[in-house]
């Protein structure tokens, strides 16, 4: 969260001049969604609960949509924002399904409690663990623009340059990696999922 804050302060400082020639309403729109994104990213990184993580995850996608389409008179920018929005929503659906499955299995969405229950019950190879974690990884693939969802990221650069630097290079596209890190103590025990993640990471690279 500290790293997000430092990068965000740099972008905000640069943005002050970058959008200074815009109308007051457009300037307000830009700063509002930029501030909302930064707040959501910080809260996402601090969250120890999958439900709140999902909520902030959704705010990240929403802010990305509006900021990519900031130049809304540009048809290509509008199209790019729509493509990014729906592709990431597809991944969010898998994330939501994973939350339902995890909630039924563990009776909680607190990450520490889930990790503790996982080891106490010695169910590392259980399919009921592998499936929801795979669904979360699919959500990460879309948000992080990994193969086969890389199509939206180059298009997202139609938004303002500071937004491309903050959201689509430094923060949102690594939010999924941070989510996997939070659940890493479980994922590292799921051999099939580890291989799945390694394949997509290597192929995208």
PLM ranges: what are they?
Residues 1-205:
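...captures the hydrophobic TM-helix bundle architecture rather than a specific catalytic motif
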């Amino acid at each position: 969260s500290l790293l997000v804050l430092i990068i965000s302060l740099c972008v905000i400082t640069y943005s002050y001049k970058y959008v200074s020639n815009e109308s007051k309403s457009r300037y307000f729109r830009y700063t509002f969604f930029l501030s909302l994104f930064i707040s959501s990213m910080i809260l996402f990184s601090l969250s120890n609960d999958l439900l709140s993580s999902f909520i902030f995850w959704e705010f990240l996608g929403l802010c990305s949509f509006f900021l990519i389409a900031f130049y809304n008179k540009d048809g290509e920018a509008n199209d790019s924002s729509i493509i990014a929005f729906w592709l990431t929503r597809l991944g969010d659906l898998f994330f939501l399904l994973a939350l339902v499955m995890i909630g039924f299995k563990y009776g909680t969405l607190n990450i520490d409690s889930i990790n503790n229950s996982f080891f106490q019950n010695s169910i590392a190879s259980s399919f009921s663990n592998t499936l929801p974690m795979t669904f979360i990884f699919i959500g990460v693939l879309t948000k992080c623009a990994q193969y086969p969802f890389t199509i939206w990221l180059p298009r997202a650069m139609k938004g303002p340059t500071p937004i491309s630097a903050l959201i689509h290079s430094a923060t949102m596209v690594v939010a999924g990696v941070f989510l996997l890190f939070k659940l890493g103590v479980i994922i590292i025990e799921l051999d099939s999922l580890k291989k799945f993640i390694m394949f997509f990471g290597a192929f995208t690279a």
